[in-house]
Amino acid sequence: MANASLNGDQSKQQQQQQQQQQQQQNYYNPNAAQSFVPQGGYQQFQQFQPQQQQQQYGGYNQYNQYQGGYQQNYNNRGGYQQGYNNRGGYQQNYNNRGGYQGYNQNQQYGGYQQYNSQPQQQQQQQSQGMSLADFQKQKTEQQASLNKPAVKKTLKLAGSSGIKLANATKKVDTTSKPQSKESSPAPAPAASASASAPQEEKKEEKEAAAATPAAAPETKKETSAPAETKKEATPTPAAKNESTPIPAAAAKKESTPVSNSASVATADALVKEQEDEIDEEVVKDMFGGKDHVSIIFMGHVDAGKSTMGGNILYLTGSVDKRTVEKYEREAKDAGRQGWYLSWVMDTNKEERNDGKTIEVGKAYFETDKRRYTILDAPGHKMYVSEMIGGASQADVGILVISARKGEYETGFEKGGQTREHALLAKTQGVNKIIVVVNKMDDSTVGWSKERYQECTTKLGAFLKGIGYAKDDIIYMPVSGYTGAGLKDRVDPKDCPWYDGPSLLEYLDNMDTMNRKINGPFMMPVSGKMKDLGTIVEGKIESGHVKKGTNLIMMPNKTPIEVLTIFNETEQECDTAFSGEQVRLKIKGIEEEDLQPGYVLTSPKNPVKTVTRFEAQIAIVELKSILSNGFSCVMHLHTAIEEVKFIELKHKLEKGTNRKSKKPPAFAKKGMKIIAILEVGELVCAETYKDYPQLGRFTLRDQGTTIAIGKITKLL
């Protein structure tokens, strides 16, 4: 028995000496790997719990999956270096789980990647099904090679090893790059990293050995028995003490700069890539320097919006004379003789019979300087939701008011749509408005300057009150039926007191729109149809799109491919840019799975989706009061959703917008509040500060616009 215990002690001392030699040479200890049994080692591994999070691994289940044991599985993965890299490595996988960050706080590559060529070749030589005798023979050869004087070599990091990893992820790249930056310079940080490297390797080797039942008692004795081992093992408990509290700090020190630098690099690469794709000069050459402007005709019912739009199309040559004459004959036969120009815009039979626009009509025309899309909004209060959808796609608003006696008053007074349309246009981001005083040729008006001033004075005060700047409001007298003041200036004989530009003259010469052609692609879906495939339509708010581009449909995150692009004239084109009204034939989603309010977006920078958000809200019209639990309808870009007030957080003082300390119990007309709102389903939204077109909304209840708001925070 004494001889047996003596032999046992000698064999243990020999193994300890081998481990010390391997640690000095930075080599992996095959003894620990030889007898690894996952089922047995799991419980010992579980005793060490720096952050109690290694249970997520399922007990080495993700490493070996209990197939082939430690040695065989890691051989299959290409040795220790490849196996640990493919699995995320001790450093990566443990850091990701938050459990072993303390090990790698000074040396992110975790020690194993130092072994590079020799150990990997030796490990790869141990093929599947190697016998114990072959392994013992190879082990003795390895020990003999360890006894040779070591040749000093330059330490290689993972990034310089020259080995290509098939499953290497971005995380491997981002962690290896800062390592090379840290270790290549000679200052203190690099020195400390290299100095702590042996300690980290020893710690990891000990844990690998402790994971086997055979090596477990040896490890315990190593840390307490011989003096030599104590000298080397004393730093390890220190590392242990450091590792328990450090993971969070280590993550802040190391992970944050890496992720920040990686995200900055990614953002820079994305911007550069998109700037390379589209050049401003290419766009100018493609369209002859003409930019695109969407204009919306809005105002009270019977103000003359459709007639004016139809006349503009005729005057610019977008509709030929024969077509107009045909409409004139048909209108005369139907007893609607004066409506024939509006029939150019109102193509629906019901619209023509009633003389009311129901849907947002769309038409296209072009001048010498610009390309235009007309959005003809319905003026009846029953169709305000359609008007909101149209206004969300417009760049410039043309507010048509009738100068005819009685009609102006009806439209402007309470219950008329003139005020509401102007407010909704402002809410939807139409910041420039042209007030067109129509029907100036009417017998009750006769181009009267007094009547013109009466109309514009009242309306001007209202427009300034809802937020329009003085420079963004333009007034002009026109006749939509005769065409006076539309393309050519008004005849001085009829109107000697007005010498300003005509409507098209002003539109052609106003400031150029600021387009984000090279921004991330974003297009809210305003309509859909099925025509040998799924077709969506809308206005491109940001970026550009080409045939064959892969995009994502939010909020359901469906990947789609653009098959065909149709421009405003229904012609196929290869590319479409920010500001244009387009139809896209797409593949990857069915028409039934789509609805207006979805957003087609770039996969690199998708739009955010939420069910709850914080917003600043101004209540403009409310019969009673609203409080927590109040529900109404929200119009957000092209989306229409029911929304509920979850919490009224603050009341804002008039003038200063100072927040109240106590939350208000209710809100009423004229108040500004900050509240948390919730929708039933996911909606695509951004904060107003980041993307104004996706961060402003309108609230309606019982057929009335009760509030406008902007999103301040996504929750």
Curated annotation (Swiss-Prot):
Residues 1-12, 26-37 have a biased composition (Polar residues). Residues 290-515 form the tr-type G domain. One of its GO terms (cellular component) is cytosol. PROSITE patterns: G_TR_1, G_TR_2. It is found in: Cytoplasm. Residues 199-208, 218-233 have a biased composition (Basic and acidic residues). Its main location: cytoplasm. Residues 479-481 are annotated as: G5. The keyword Translocase does not apply. GTP binds at residues 299-306, 376-380, 438-441. The modification Phosphothreonine is found at T373. GO terms for molecular function: GTP binding; GTPase activity; translation release factor activity. GO terms for biological process: cytoplasmic translational termination; nuclear-transcribed mRNA catabolic process, deadenylation-dependent decay. It comes from the Eukaryota. Residues 5-128 are annotated as: Several sort of repeats. Keywords: Cytoplasm, GTP-binding, Nucleotide-binding, Phosphoprotein, Protein biosynthesis, Repeat. Residues 13-25, 39-129, 176-198 have a biased composition (Low complexity). Residues 299-306 are annotated as: G1. Residues 129-285 are annotated as: Charged. Residues 1-148, 168-262 are annotated as: Disordered. Residues 376-379 are annotated as: G3. Involved in translation termination. Stimulates the activity of ERF1. Binds guanine nucleotides. Belongs to the TRAFAC class translation factor GTPase superfamily. Classic translation factor GTPase family. ERF3 subfamily. PANTHER family: TRANSLATION FACTOR. This is Eukaryotic peptide chain release factor GTP-binding subunit. It comes from Candida albicans (Yeast). The lineage of its organism: Eukaryota, Fungi, Dikarya, Ascomycota, Saccharomycotina.
